[in-house]
Design a protein with these regions (language model features):
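Surface-exposed molecular-recognition determinants
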Residues: 1-344
Length: 344
């Protein structure tokens, strides 16, 4: 077993298969009884309907809304559509997810909001614990960030100064939610320029980034830097480069020709972020955490006895994307179909 600083992985990530009821306040509780987890991000997909029949992907995130109260109403982010992000106010009667609860979440039934609570339909939910909900926008240009604009490991920070040295202005970092234990961070960055660097508040170099513009001008983009035990690599050399594609679209996961300037302390704005001027981007960032997460590349052999990919732990979720060919992202988890042979 790989050495890990994550004592209980289920405190940071859970998978839930559930059924819609069509009724108001459909409370979904996680299956695990050893610990509870209040999620910050929930990715949901219908098992009963394809995307063309209304079974859309939605990423529910409490951090995207500019919330100041205690009620956590999630925004709806559409990963594989160019639809703009749907924001909801402080009313618990709006939005498909009424609340993120102490050990699950509660669904609504009103109108189109019941898209993930249709009676008789089955759904999958992949749920992450980030760093909690920041409740203020950062306006500081140097030194400490505005109080409560960053939440670290569930605690709002009243006087936090980024330790990393970076070139982008501090005022571009509007909100941050970071889980330093599991290695995941959410950021809202606005008005940056290509090449600007910003702290990502994690303990190691990011290996996967999901980016969604605030406007409806593009699908969620996935950037993946291939990793091994010791270094970041690319098949054509040792540069810190990777692969990029739109989330769950049937496009080719192609080589990203640029060298990434991401390091163990900062990440770099890219020329296709569309962040110039007042445009904002939302970033969900992961770094590899031994015993909790693994990001790597393998080569298929075309046989029923396929290659064995070492993770160092028993994964609850495996996401696969074929490189260099038009194919969707594929999700495997420990709750949807569990008939595969388990190899400890």
């Amino acid at each position: 077993m790989a050495y890990t600083t994550v004592d209980l992985a289920q405190s940071h990530f859970k998978v839930k298969r559930y059924s819609g009821t069509g009724s108001n306040s459909n409370a979904i509780t996680f299956d695990e009884t050893t610990n509870s987890m209040q999620p910050d991000v929930v990715l949901v997909k219908s098992r009963s309907k394809g995307t063309g029949a209304g079974g859309i992907w939605v990423l529910y995130s409490i951090m995207v809304n500019n919330q100041t109260g205690g009620t956590k109403i999630s925004s709806e982010v559409y990963p594989n559509a160019t639809t703009a992000i749907s924001h909801y106010g402080s009313s618990a009667t709006t939005g498909a997810l009424k609340s993120m609860d102490s050990n699950g979440f509660t669904l609504d039934s009103e109108g189109d909001n019941k898209r993930h609570n249709l009676s008789g339909d089955s759904y999958m939910a992949w749920c992450w614990k980030f760093g909690g909900n920041p409740t203020a926008d950062n306006t500081a240009t140097s030194g400490a960030m505005t109080a409560n604009s960053i939440s670290i490991d569930g605690t709002l920070q009243s006087n936090h100064t980024p330790s990393a040295s970076f070139t982008g202005g501090l005022e571009h970092i509007q909100r941050v939610s970071v889980n330093t234990v599991a290695g995941c961070c959410w950021m809202k960055i606005s008005g940056a320029s290509n090449g600007d660097t910003f702290p990502h508040f994690l303990n190691s170099t990011p290996t996967m980034i999901w980016k969604k513009p605030q406007s409806g001008t593009g699908a969620m983009e996935v950037s993946l830097v291939e990793a091994n035990e010791d270094a970041f690599f690319h098949e054509s050399g040792t540069n810190n480069r990777g692969k990029k594609d739109d989330f769950v679209n049937n496009a080719s996961f192609a080589d990203d020709a640029r060298d990434y300037d991401n390091t163990s302390s900062v990440l770099a704005a890219e020329d296709d972020w569309s962040v110039n001027g007042s445009e904002a981007n939302y970033l969900w960032i992961w770094s590899e955490t031994p015993g909790f997460s693994r990001y790597n590349r393998y080569e298929g052999n075309g046989n029923t006895n396929g290659p064995k990919v070492m993770c160092g732990f028993k994964p609850a979720l495996v996401i696969i994307k074929r490189v260099g060919a038009s194919s969707p992202f594929i999700f495997f988890d420990n709750k949807n179909k569990t008939t595969n042979t388990t190899i400890e």
